[in-house]
């Protein structure tokens, strides 16, 4: 297929401090036939362990150069605080573009498996054959290419993966991202924390579109249970600060809530999505007519005069 030639289905696993890389292990276990790599920064102290274990699959970017153009949405610097995932996400986009790809996948490094809705069995089933995952992801990537989607993906194995929701979609991509590799369509990632929500906010309010399908799912390790990555930052600063970055990005649409036994964010996507308006509101049609001037009855005027004289 044309999109297959353009290369839209390569997986890049973004990882730091986790050289065993559960996602890579999972892809090997199911014998995934497609191309995949692990992307690490040159600031990672465990980089030699990655290279020893995964060899040429490890791609290294210059983290020190990347942070000079990273917008963390704060002034905390990089000496005491981790940079977050934005440097590696933006660097991965450039790596993919330089390799001649039209689109690419960005995965986290803690995936334990994948499930998919089976029409024959009428339920979600575990994917044990990597070829099934490859074909399912290729269909999503090809759709993203044809529709010029700025982000498209699939959901985590949570309540969103319930079989009843298999034909619905989510208005944002939480984890498995299929992104454009060319700078004309790619929306740069910003924010030290909560970068996935902020990226969705920036896509939607610029008139773009992103979505997650719910018939393909990721089985993942318990949140903040894996060492490395962003776990230490979340444990030290809490998820309330994570929500704060979302509020900074869209204060009218994001708020702090308490759910899943922790502080979390809630986003009113309806306040961010572009809306189709009636032609009568078009600027070419001019502004709506001014309302008629209010007229006062004689009785009200007489009463006003009475009070005015009394005050004088």
Model-derived regions, located:
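C-terminal catalytic/acceptor-binding lobe
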Residues: 6-9, 18-22, 191-193, 197-312
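Hydrophobic beta-strand segments of well-ordered beta-sheets in folded domains
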Residues: 8-12, 33-39, 57-59, 148-152, ...
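Short, well-formed alpha-helical segments that are part of the catalytic scaffolds
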Residues: 10-36, 44-51
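Short, solvent-exposed loop/turn segments at secondary-structure junctions
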Residues: 18, 44, 66, 110-112, ...
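A short acidic (Asp/Glu
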Residues: 22-25, 48-51, 115-119, 162-167, ...
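Active-site-proximal specificity loops/subdomain of glycosyltransferases
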Residues: 42-107, 112-125
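A structural signal for short, well-ordered beta-strand segments and their strand-loop junctions
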Residues: 103-108, 150-155, 210-214, 255-258
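Conserved catalytic core of nucleotide-sugar-dependent glycosyltransferases
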Residues: 112-197, 201, 311
């Amino acid at each position: 297929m044309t999109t297959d030639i353009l290369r839209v289905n390569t997986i890049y696993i973004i990882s730091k401090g986790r050289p065993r890389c559960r996602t890579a292990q999972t892809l090997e276990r199911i014998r995934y036939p497609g191309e995949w790599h692990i992307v690490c920064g040159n600031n990672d102290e465990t980089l030699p362990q990655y290279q020893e274990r995964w060899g040429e699959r490890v791609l290294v970017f210059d983290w020190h150069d990347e942070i000079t153009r990273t917008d963390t949405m704060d002034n905390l610097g990089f000496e005491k605080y981790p940079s977050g995932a934005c440097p590696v996400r933006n660097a991965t986009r450039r790596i993919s573009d330089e390799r001649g790809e039209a689109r690419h996948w960005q995965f986290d490094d803690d995936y334990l498996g994948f499930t998919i809705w089976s029409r024959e069995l009428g339920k979600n089933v575990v994917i044990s054959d990597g070829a099934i995952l490859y074909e399912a992801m290729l269909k999503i990537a090809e759709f993203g290419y044809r529709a010029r989607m700025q982000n498209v993906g699939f959901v985590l194995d949570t309540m969103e993966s319930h079989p009843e929701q298999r034909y619905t979609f989510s208005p944002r991509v939480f984890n498995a991202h299929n992104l454009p590799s060319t700078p004309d369509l790619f929306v740069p990632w910003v924010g030290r924390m909560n970068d996935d929500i902020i990226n969705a906010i920036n896509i939607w309010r610029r008139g773009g579109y992103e979505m997650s399908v719910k018939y393909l799912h990721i089985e993942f390790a318990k949140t903040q249970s894996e060492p490395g990555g962003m776990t230490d930052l979340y444990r030290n600063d809490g998820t309330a600060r994570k929500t704060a970055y979302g509020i900074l990005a869209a204060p009218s649409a994001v708020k702090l809530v308490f759910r899943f036994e922790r502080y979390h964010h809630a986003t009113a996507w309806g306040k961010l999505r572009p809306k189709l308006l009636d032609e009568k509101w078009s600027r070419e049609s001019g502004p709506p007519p001014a309302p008629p001037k209010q007229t006062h009855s004689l009785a009200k005027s007489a009463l006003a005069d009475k009070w005015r004289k009394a005050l004088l």
